[in-house]
Curated annotation (Swiss-Prot):
Originating organism: Canis lupus familiaris (Dog)
Family, similarity comment: Belongs to the TRAFAC class dynamin-like GTPase superfamily. Dynamin/Fzo/YdjA family.
Domain of life: Eukaryota
Region named G2 motif: 150-152
Transmembrane segments: none
GO cellular component terms, semicolon-separated: cytoplasm; exocytic vesicle; microtubule; nucleus; plasma membrane; presynapse; synapse
Recorded name of the encoding gene: MX2
Sequence ranges assigned to domain Dynamin-type G in this UniProt record: 115-387
Protein name as catalogued: Interferon-induced GTP-binding protein Mx2
Residue span of region G5 motif: 326-329
Upregulation: By type I and type III interferons.
């Protein structure tokens, strides 16, 4: 044991980067500039993938390379002593560690985490929990320390073990990247980065700082250090600093892809720690939570058994359990105790402690054991997450591509190209208007074609005509009696007073005018909405062009509506003439008379009237005769109006309206000096297009990285 924990405490627990991993390719992916429009379309798909063809699944064939379960990993330690490193199971595991972590790190560097959650280990803890000491012990470098909030931005700590190279570090944030060879520079550079990002005060920021450390002494591991939890604002801190920090932490730990590393001091009641409460809130079963107990040397005498119970998962159960570590105290830091010496001192502490020795024997104590455990957990977590991640990247890439398609192409700068661009836009718009007019437009599920909406109005018009004729049937006897008493002259019984008939016809024809105009107005609105929606679909990103077209739609609608209304009113004025061809009217009249004289026969059809007559009279009264004529005339008039009014509306409101709009669109092309003005985009549209192109680019690179990893 002592030999394993010498001056290079992690060497036994860490791995060699396999030379065959595509590190150069990963770097190449990260260094490429965002592509042009044409290049972006090419980069949206991995090699050998075709647009429109179902995406290949890259994971199934090679994914078993990572399927090492925890028992295999644990057992590999003992096998390593008996077998050569190349043949041991643990050696196989080592060959997979660095590529897996590098893959996720490269995806994070590409910015994929803006779109999707990546597998990660997030480190959280209350202030003064010993979180910084744990990270220092793992990384081998001094991190910002002090009272109050020292971690003010999320810090991505990438640890890479390379036994063949000297220590080197790299810090990157925003557009800054610094490299250094002295570990003592780390604390200063982190503080400077935090001041630039979060300001000189005590505020915090969600913006990431990335610190990469390559050394023979560090484990292969990536952690995300989050600000320590505070309850009360101190000094110049914002009053809601506690709320801000909790919101930042929750943003990370609530993701299912995140393992939560909760740092808790041994000398406090574990049930009262805010960090563990937050972890339990987002992970009630503790499936994603690992507890790290710190400061075991500060526990009160007599409470050691309580600490052991916690470490053995008997007090506050977590599915992944607990680890316990002893890091450098403030006095040891002041005395410049090296991390290697601290590791040896830690080992001796646990080895000689009467209570905590058992935890060391169980592999639950010391920083080196923690490092090995975290590396193992991260690899298994990546293994578990990659299939879903590949699917999410593919689906997100497709959604972004579809959104970019809806935004349309970028506007050309050349005037001639602008003309062709506008011609194409107008051509596509006119084609869609044609489809609306012909009833051939493509509709989504639960949507209705324009023609069907108009047809519903026409069907309602037929019902109005039926109701009007039924009204005549219901009151004709009463009204004819009134007219006969007022207007009958010297005619004998049975002679029809034509004036009475004509007056009733005029009255009930007039009642149809307003329903016909109502149908016209509703149809106008239906067509206007369809044309407007089509214009928005094609031109919504161009505010000036969109407004110009909307004005044309309104103007043409008004003209066609006025023409249609005038023709409808003219039609009803003509209906006041009371006319029907003799040949047609005689047939209808004969049919009605037959039904009247045969009341026990076939039931009358729609728009037909039937009147009772005394069976002992061979002829009808004048009232009855007028009723028969009204029935016959309204039968024929209703047929005429049922077709004629919809004809007028359909022709002027749909056909002529659409045709005039298409011609007006072509006239826009004559205004060449207006092209630049017409094609001005909304500011947010160009920003959205730029954002989507960048998103598609990084997701395409992520897909390429996954493809290269599994190929």
């Amino acid at each position: 044991m002592s030999k394993a924990h010498g001056s290079r405490p992690y060497r036994r627990h860490n791995v060699v980067i396999p030379r065959q991993q595509p590190e150069k390719e990963m770097n190449f992916v990260q260094q490429q500039p965002p592509p042009s429009d044409a290049a972006a379309r090419q980069m949206m798909y991995p090699p050998n993938c075709q647009v429109g063809v179902q995406d290949p699944v890259y994971l199934a064939k090679e994914f078993n390379l990572l399927t090492l379960n925890p028992q295999q990993l644990e057992g590999s330690r003992h096998q390593q002593m008996a077998k050569g490193p190349e043949k041991s199971l643990y050696s196989q595991y080592e060959q997979k560690v660095r590529p897996c972590i590098d893959l996720v790190d490269s995806l994070r560097a590409l910015g994929v985490e803006q779109d999707l959650a990546l597998p990660a280990i997030a480190v959280i803890g209350d202030q003064s929990s010993g979180k910084s000491s744990v990270l220092e012990a793992l990384s081998g470098v001094a991190l910002p320390r002090g009272s109050g909030i020292v971690t003010r931005c999320p810090l991505v700590l990438k640890l890479k073990r390379d036994p063949h190279k000297a220590w080197r570090g790299r810090i990157s944030y925003r557009k800054t990247e610094l490299q250094f060879q002295d570990p003592s520079q780390v604390e200063k550079e982190i503080r400077q980065a935090q001041n630039i990002i979060a300001g000189q005060g005590l505020g915090i920021s969600h913006e990431l700082i990335s610190l990469e450390i390559t050394s023979p002494e560090v484990p292969d591991l990536t952690l995300i250090d989050l600000p320590g939890i505070t309850r009360v604002a101190v000094g110049n801190q914002p009053q809601d600093i506690g709320v801000q920090i909790k919101a930042l932490i929750k943003n990370y730990i609530q993701k299912q892809e995140t393992i939560n590393l909760v740092v808790v001091p041994c000398n406090v009641d574990i049930a009262t720690t805010e960090a563990l409460s937050m972890a339990q809130e987002v992970d009630p079963n503790g499936d994603r939570t690992i507890g790290v107990l710190t400061k075991p040397d500060l526990v009160d005498r007599g409470t050691e058994k309580t600490v052991v119970n916690v470490a053995q998962n008997l007090t506050y159960h977590l599915q992944k359990g607990y680890m316990i570590v002893r890091c450098r105290g403030q006095e040891e830091i002041t005395n410049q105790l090296s991390l290697a010496e601290a590791t040896e001192k830690e080992r001796m502490f646990f080895q000689t402690h009467p209570y905590f020795r058992a935890l060391l024997e169980e592999g639950k104590a010391t920083v080196p054991c923690l490092a090995e455990r975290l590396t193992k957990e991260l690899i298994l977590h990546i293994n578990k997450s990659l299939p879903l991640l590949e699917k999410q990247i593919r689906e997100s890439h497709q959604r972004a591509t579809d959104e970019l398609h809806q935004c349309g192409d970028s506007i050309p700068s050349n005037e001639a190209d602008k003309m062709f661009f506008l011609i194409e836009k107008i051509k596509l718009f006119n084609q869609d208007i044609d489809k609306l007019i012909e009833g051939e437009e493509i509709v989504k599920k639960n949507e209705t074609r324009l023609y069907n909406k108009i047809r519903e109005e026409f069907e309602h018009w037929a019902l109005v005509l039926t109701a009007n004729t039924q009204k005549v049937k219901n009151i004709v006897s009463e009204e004819v009696s009134v007219y006969e008493k007022q207007y009958r002259g010297k005619e004998l019984l049975g002679f029809v007073n034509y004036k009475t008939f004509e007056t009733i016809v005029h009255q009930y024809i007039e009642q149809l005018v307003e329903p016909a105009l109502t149908m016209l107005r509703k149809t106008i609105e239906i067509v206007w909405q369809a044309f407007t929606d089509t214009a928005k679909k094609h031109f919504s990103v161009f505010s000036n062009l969109s407004q110009t077209i909307q004005n044309k739609i309104e103007d043409i609608k008004t003209r066609q509506a006025e023409t249609a209304e005038n023709l409808i009113r003219l039609q009803f004025r003509m209906e006041q003439l009371v006319y029907c061809q003799d040949q047609i009217y005689s047939v209808v009249l004969r049919k009605v008379r037959k039904e009247v004289f045969n009341p026990a026969g076939k039931a009358a059809q729609d728009l037909q009237l039937k009147f009772p007559f005394p069976k002992d009279l061979p002829s009808m009264s004048s009232n009855d005769e007028i009723g028969v004529h009204l029935n016959a005339y309204f039968l024929e008039t209703s047929k005429r109006l049922a077709n004629q009014i919809p004809f007028i509306i359909q022709y002027f409101v749909l056909q002529e309206n659409g045709s005039c709009l298409q011609k007006a669109m072509m006239q826009i092309l004559q205004e060449r000096e207006q092209y630049s003005w017409l094609l001005q985009e909304h500011a947010d549209t160009s920003a959205k297009r730029r954002f989507l192109k960048e998103k598609i680019y990084r997701l395409a690179q992520a897909r390429r990285a996954l493809y290269m990893f599994f190929s």
